[in-house]
């Protein structure tokens, strides 16, 4: 599959931070609530949210809001999407030719 330069850049940026790699690993085990991820990483929810947004933009994760029984607040859960990262010379040729 030929990727655009923009897609390649988003993927590269998403994988360029150790916290985001750790988030991918954590989400490979099960879907998680953002506060649970923040607590386990010992980071603020805001910082984890920024990392997850970058992973979501690159197509690695997806999220949804849910209302839990006995709790009227919406909770944002994240899960890993199936992915296979490859950068082929053919992609580069198509982008720059």
Where are these regions (language model features)?
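Key DNA-contact positions within bacterial/archaeal DNA-binding proteins
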Residues: 46
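Conserved segment of winged-helix/HTH DNA-binding domains
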Residues: 69-97
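A short acidic, leucine-rich amphipathic alpha-helix
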Residues: 36-40, 55
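Beta-hairpin "wing" of winged helix-turn-helix
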Residues: 58-72
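Hydrophobic residues on short alpha-helical segments
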Residues: 21-27
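Short alpha-helical segments that sit at the start of domains
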Residues: 1-21
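Residues within the DNA-recognition helix of helix-turn-helix
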Residues: 51
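Short capping segments at the starts of secondary-structure elements
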Residues: 18, 29-36
């Amino acid at each position: 599959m030929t990727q655009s330069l923009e897609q390649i850049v988003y993927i590269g940026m998403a994988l360029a931070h150790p916290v985001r790699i750790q988030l991918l690993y954590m989400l490979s085990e099960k879907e998680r609530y953002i506060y649970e991820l923040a607590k386990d990483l010992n980071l603020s929810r805001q910082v984890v949210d920024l990392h997850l947004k970058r992973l979501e933009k690159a197509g690695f994760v997806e999220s949804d809001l849910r209302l839990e029984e006995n709790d009227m607040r919406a909770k944002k859960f994240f899960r890993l999407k199936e992915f296979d990262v490859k950068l082929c010379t053919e992609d580069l040729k198509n982008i720059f030719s």
